Amino acid sequence: MNQKEIDHLESINSFYAKGDYMDQLSIEREIEIIKQYPVNGKSVLEVGCGSGYSTERLIKIFPDYEVIEPSQKNISLLKQKISNIICHNVLLEDFSSKRKYDYIFFLNIIEHVEDPIESLKALTSIVKDEGLIFISSPNCMSLNRRAGYKMGTLETYEKMAPKDYEVGHRRLYTVDMLTDHCNQAGLKVLSMKGIYLKPLSEKQMIELGDSVVRAFHALGEEIPQYCATIMAVATKKYY
């Protein structure tokens, strides 16, 4: 058990406890993409549940559902929403199971972990041979970050914003970087999706209103390289 890592995760719980409107919209869009794949009879493992916002919605689609969550504070938030869910209170690196899952949801987690490639390898070992792993992360080459760089408000594309540090991000991704990490872990990316084409700052987007923001969330699906969030749908290369 890596107590330092658990302490790190507990320290950012306040973000999940208070909730975030824009993050919730992104989660809803991620779920819409997941629903494009077969759902009946699929066993699911979600790695990291945050406040439980995604879990509460996904378990209605996938009744055979388990969660890995190392933060006891996050588990408490989850249990307030779903009291009877199977939840493993361990780090991914410490999770041991004879069971293999049809789908694994690794949504907005890879940017938090110490060693992303090792984490992906761990997922590869517990997904079924033809199962799918859904991996989402913030994109440092998003349209708004490209604009910020051109305006001189962003020193480099890779530089993280204050909110990134607030929520415990260790890195930001690009489409190529996420694809490469999957490849190194023995995964093949079947599809790369974009979530939230974000041309303006978060504050400016919110001021445009809910319907506009939702439209831009959907608009970016086929142009991931410009979106605020990217999602890889991956499967094992070898089995």
Predicted regions and their residues:
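Short glycine- and Lys/Arg-enriched binding-loop motifs that mark or flank ligand-binding interfaces
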Residues: 44-46, 127, 164
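Surface-exposed loop/turn positions
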Residues: 42, 130-131
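S-adenosyl-L-methionine-dependent methyltransferase catalytic module, highlighting the catalytic core
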Residues: 17-21, 25, 53, 114-125, ...
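Active-site acidic short loop of glycosyltransferases
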Residues: 98-102, 115, 129
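A short His-aromatic
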Residues: 108-112
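Conserved N-terminal segment of class I S-adenosyl-L-methionine
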Residues: 1-99, 103-107, 120, 194-197, ...
